[in-house]
Amino acid sequence: KPFHLVQFAMMGDAYAKYILGKDEPRIGVLSNGEEEGKGNELTREVHAILSETDLNYIGYVEGRDLNSGEVDVIVCDGFVGNVALKISEGLWETIHAILRWEARDNIRAKAAYFLMGRAIRRLEKRLDYSEYGGAPLLGVNGNCVICHGSSNGKAIMNAILLASNL
């Protein structure tokens, strides 16, 4: 329901302000384009409602904005959000596997991979889900962090640290 997604935007705004320290979090609705009228009935209704709020609503955002830093809170329904999250989680694994494969038989590529080590580790910290551990379940009475079903020890530890800071 549109009302639920508007509530998600409000909770995301509060989380970004009070936990992430963002003064005016930029909020967007995930859609298939940034142009007016894009999306399905649900996203168009949510867009119309959020446009009338005091939130710093910037309009529709696309999948490419998930990790861009251009938006602080991306609003979508749970199914779409879960699919987007799983794509993002797989991104690092895919990039890392391709880099290793390409460096396998080529001495120049191996040298470049070695020289890029620090940058690759920084990229991994940004894209590896275990670095974050989990995501807070907002709107419940208490602290709750949801972890990936295949979380490793590092992810669980980071989820516990996240929960302790909520």
Name each model-derived stretch.
Residues D13-Y15, I58-E70, F79, Y129-Y132:
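Glycine-rich, charged/polar anion/phosphate-binding loops
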Residues E70-I74, G78-L166:
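Glycine-rich phosphate/nucleotide-binding loop
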Residues P2-G63:
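Glycine-rich phosphate/diphosphate-binding loop of Rossmann-like nucleotide-binding domains
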Residues I19-E24, A48-E52, D65-S68, R126-S130, ...:
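Solvent-exposed alpha-helices and their adjacent loops that cap or buttress functional pockets
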Residues K1, G28, L42-E45, D105-N106, ...:
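A generic short-segment signal for beta-strand/edge and adjacent turn/coil regions
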